[in-house]
């Protein structure tokens, strides 16, 4: 199925629906069994989505090169909220309950309430966060330092 753009982000799959961000600033929902688009969300600034999308019960959430986290309604593809950072986002986020965690090129790891799109937690790592986030039993782990490979673990 042609997306008219190349992909860097990995797709998220829930049932028959596949969600992925593109290099041309789209987040798309595809019915992979039918090979048809369900919806397309176009970010206003049309900048790349290199971070993989995370899917909750109601939302599809992804960070973009436009320095924004975009949350779109899973059923319609309409924007629910955006959250601004100070640099592009290449880090794939993670969802814990009703909280979305994502790192940014501004050196911050953010915790966002997915019901409101509001910041509920922030940690300044001092350097770009580009590695994806891993969730374990009672902890969140992210690689922070591109120079020496430092891992940060939050419990």
Feature roles, as predicted:
Residues 1-14, 23, 37-56, 65, ...:
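Extracytoplasmic beta-rich repeat domains
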Residues 21, 33, 63, 75, ...:
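Glycine-rich phosphate/oxyanion-binding loops and their immediately adjacent helices
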Residues 31-35, 73-77, 113-117, 155:
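Short loop/turn segments that connect beta-strands within beta-propeller blades
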Residues 28, 70, 110, 150-152:
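WD40 beta-propeller blade core
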């Amino acid at each position: 199925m042609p997306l008219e753009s190349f992909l860097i982000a990995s797709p998220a799959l829930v049932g028959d629906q596949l969600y992925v961000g593109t290099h041309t600033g789209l987040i798309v929902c595809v019915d992979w069994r039918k090979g048809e688009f369900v919806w397309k969300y176009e970010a206003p600034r049309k900048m790349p989505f290199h971070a993989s999308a995370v899917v909750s019960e109601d939302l599809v959430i992804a960070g973009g090169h436009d320095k924004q986290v975009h949350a779109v309604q899973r059923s319609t593809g309409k924007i629910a909220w955006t959250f601004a950072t100070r640099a592009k986002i290449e880090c794939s986020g993670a969802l814990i309950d009703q909280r979305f965690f994502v790192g940014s090129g501004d050196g911050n790891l953010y915790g966002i309430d997915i019901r409101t799109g509001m910041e509920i937690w922030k940690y300044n790592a001092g350097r770009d966060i580009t590695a994806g986030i891993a969730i374990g039993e009672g902890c969140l782990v992210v690689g922070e330092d591109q120079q020496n490979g430092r891992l940060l673990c939050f419990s």
